[in-house]
Amino acid sequence: GSVALRLDKNILSKLKMPKTVISVTGSSGKGSTCNLIVDIARKQGKSVVFNDKGSNLVTGILTTLLAACNLKGELKQDILVTEIDERYTKLLFKYLKPNYVVITNITRDQPPRHGNFEIVYEEIKKALTKDMHLVLNADDPYTQKFILNSQNKYTLFGIGTNKYTYNDEKFENLNIKYCPKCNSKLLYNYYHCETLGNYYCPNCDFKRRKPLIEVTKLDYEKSFVVVNDEYKFNIPFNTLFEVYNTLAAFTIASLINLNLDEACNTISKMPVNLKIFNKYTYNDRIVYVLNNKAENATTYNQSLLFVKRNTELKTLIIGWKEISRRYNFDDLSWLYDIEFELLSNNEIDKIICIGPQAYDIATRLKYANIEEEKIVVIPLIDEAVKFIKSKTKGNIYGILNFDMVEPFNNNMKGEKSGN
């Protein structure tokens, strides 16, 4: 892709895309959503091009397109699915011309890179044209801004009330608290997480709209979802955002006229992505490994809800190797957007802080009123795991950035691993 752009900076405009083009963007969940869409379509005999081996920036996507096109620059496949970095939609949408645009969410993410999330919203908004069909989360009041005063067709997905919803606000640092139309404070019939839920404005007509695709039954313990009281499928792991990613893919399947019963079968048979979620045992203790995204408080908050949902005695390990691979910043402002206060009254034996910012994590936990005797700082992963194995109690929860997942698993399973 890089070489092709040097040879011809207009090369993207010379490629002919398939009839159906689906682009997925947002702060998190892009890759998971794309993988589901691609698997559902391929299992039903569709030929699909997907940038799973390239990056989600211009050169990575161009590499994928060039590998899939013929000598005339035509992509003859049935469907093109692209995962696109939210800041690159403005550069790519004008060439890809997606029929469907899935916007998973827009949250506080990578502050040194993005600044305020409003900047991300504005850049995606400018990239949209009126012929693009938007697929959005009905439970997210922020993404509804894309369809206010808009000519775009849109389809919504969401989750109805269930045994996991709650009525009182649990999170302080939120993306949106006020109505985007009249600036009144939004009220909620129920919450799922952060600002996700059944919201309404008391002073104007802004409210959660009825989604076309809605979860009518959700059971994390039995790992299944029922959609529209008709379609049932298993979810590969029991987190809220996995449900949302799956709903987004299921919505696309319905819009491009795939068989939804077959889609349910495909989703139910999807293997767990062990890089995102893992579960195994160590000496009769269950080990949960949750992959979180550094610089994104929302991913940590949904992990904390997962921890809080399980009421048994537990040990936590939290940390990362690098805050960012792309930028040489050690910005930790996002650490104070994570609602660690959810853990203050939970059944916790110890919380082990690891990595180069282990002491910063410990300081944040103290501000969250976690008892000081429960907080342990052990920067090196191998030493931390030895401590967990010998001096802690209860099930084990790894709330880790992706760069600590493999070292943690290797050490827990007794394999050699670097720090």
Where would I find each of the regions flagged by the language model?
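Adenine nucleotide phosphate-binding catalytic loops in nucleotide-utilizing enzymes
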Residues: 155-298
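ATP-dependent carboxylate-amine ligase
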Residues: 1, 183, 196, 201-205, ...
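Phosphate-binding loop of NTP-binding sites
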Residues: 1-161, 166-178
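A generic structural signal for short, well-ordered alpha-helical segments in conserved domains
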Residues: 34-39, 250, 362, 409
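Buried hydrophobic packing segments
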Residues: 37, 41, 61-65, 246-256, ...
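Glycine-rich nucleotide phosphate-binding loop and flanking beta-alpha elements
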Residues: 30, 88, 109, 141-142, ...
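Residue-level signal for inorganic ion chemistry
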Residues: 83, 104, 135, 245, ...
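Short, surface-exposed acidic/glycine-rich loop or hinge patches that mediate macromolecular interfaces
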Residues: 27, 55-56, 240, 257, ...
